[in-house]
């Protein structure tokens, strides 16, 4: 059965009934769930039953779409509005971080794998409009292994039924060649009368994340953010999760997931802006993704401030943001220098010489030559110190 698609950059609204015991729905109450990428998940509730929970870690529910769902968070319904009369009624709006579809899941439910698709990933892999050049692969395109983690780049293909109408969509200027193909197809159909043809409709790439020590939902989602954070740097723009689908052990189908993210509208617009494979600063042809992810999983936490800067980019800069970014980037250069064994005197230039392209180095040199003839390293150090200390002359 096909998994229903829930995209994290779109808006959704649901009505449903909810309760807090996995095997007992007494004390259930009515609520509306609102989801948007900028406000996240919000439960708009009305509780009148004395057996309904006042606080809980998890809620189970059925939606007006006919789906089961599991809401994960810390729910405290005593913090909303309380109405007194013939009974006590609790109402309010309560945010929560995670919503799972299709079934009821206990907090300790075991995960087989988690599938992540990212905005821009398809274009990063191959130019849009030329996907017929690619073959569907049953095996992973690459496998990267980290500490207790395995990451695979896999593809999924969907087909549309065409049957005997396959002959109607084939054409060739060489009439003899066309007649030969039609003849061979008819002959094949005679040999295999039960054969039923379909044509590829869509080929989609996504990451598959597996844990070797049964880590939970929040750990898998954290790893999703590590992956999208790296792609934000590679693509030089916010790269947001498009879909997250979790495969629980013992469950026949994957479970869609919505998350509270809290992105600004300008960040979402920038993330959804169309990109071109040929114009990207880096695409799949330029790098070894498997090797990069093996290293990234070891250092992702250290560079979280940098990835967050890229992921929450809006395309606009205030003076405060510009100053903050300069200090942050200088600090990251120092961290990279330490990683590659550079000395204190080369803390800015060694990382640049090691990893920057000649074009980038020339652009930085041209910028600083407007002000002086000092080296790039000296100018970065001066600029960083001017901004980091209030009393320094700017």
Kindly give the residue locations of the regions a language model identified.
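Glycine-centered secondary-structure boundary/capping sites
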Residues: 66-68, 73-74, 148, 236, ...
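Long, contiguous, compositionally biased segments that the model treats as domain-scale units
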Residues: 1-228
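Amphipathic, oligomerization/interface secondary-structure segments
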Residues: 2-5, 248-251, 258-394
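Generic hydrophobic, helix-prone segments enriched in Leu/Val/Ile
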Residues: 31, 151, 231-232, 296-297, ...
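Helix N-terminus capping/helix-initiation residues
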Residues: 117-119, 124, 215-216, 236, ...
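Basic/polar, acidic-poor N-terminal "presequence/leader" segments
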Residues: 196-270
């Amino acid at each position: 059965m096909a998994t229903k698609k829930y995209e994290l950059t779109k808006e959704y609204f649901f009505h449903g009934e909810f309760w807090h015991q996995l095997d007992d729905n007494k004390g259930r109450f009515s609520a509306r769930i609102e989801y948007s990428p900028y406000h996240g998940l919000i439960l708009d509730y009305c509780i009148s039953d004395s057996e309904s929970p006042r606080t809980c870690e998890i809620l189970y529910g059925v939606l007006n779409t006919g789906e089961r769902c599991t809401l994960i968070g810390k729910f405290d319904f005593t913090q909303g509005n309380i109405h007194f009369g013939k009974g006590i009624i609790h109402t309010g709006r309560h945010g929560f971080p995670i919503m799972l579809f299709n079934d009821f899941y206990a907090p300790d439910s075991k995960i087989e794998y988690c599938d992540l698709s990212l905005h821009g990933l398809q274009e990063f892999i191959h130019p849009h409009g030329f996907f017929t050049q690619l073959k569907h692969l049953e095996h992973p395109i690459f496998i990267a292994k980290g500490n207790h983690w395995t990451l695979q780049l896999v593809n999924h293909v969907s087909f549309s039924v065409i049957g005997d109408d396959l002959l109607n969509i084939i054409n060739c200027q060489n009439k003899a060649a066309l007649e030969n193909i039609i003849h061979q197809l008819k002959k094949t159909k005679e040999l295999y009368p039960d054969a039923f043809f379909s044509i590829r409709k869509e080929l989609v790439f996504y990451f598959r994340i597996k844990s070797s020590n049964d880590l939970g939902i929040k750990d898998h989602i954290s790893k999703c953010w590590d992956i999208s954070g790296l792609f934000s740097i590679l693509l030089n723009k916010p790269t947001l999760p498009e879909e997250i689908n979790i495969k629980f052990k013992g469950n026949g189908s994957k479970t869609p997931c919505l998350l509270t993210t809290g992105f600004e509208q300008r960040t979402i617009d920038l993330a959804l802006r169309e990109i071109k494979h040929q114009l990207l600063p880096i695409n799949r042809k330029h790098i070894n993704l498997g090797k990069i992810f093996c290293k990234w999983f070891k250092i992702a936490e250290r560079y979280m401030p940098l990835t967050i800067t890229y992921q929450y980019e809006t395309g606009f800069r205030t003076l405060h943001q510009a100053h903050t970014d300069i200090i942050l980037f200088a600090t990251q250069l120092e961290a990279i220098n330490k990683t590659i064994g550079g000395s204190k005197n080369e803390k800015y230039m060694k990382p640049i010489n090691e990893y920057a392209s000649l074009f980038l180095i020339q652009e930085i040199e041209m910028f600083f030559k407007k002000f002086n003839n000092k080296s790039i390293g000296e100018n970065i150090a001066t600029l960083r110190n001017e901004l980091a200390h209030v009393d320094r002359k700017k």
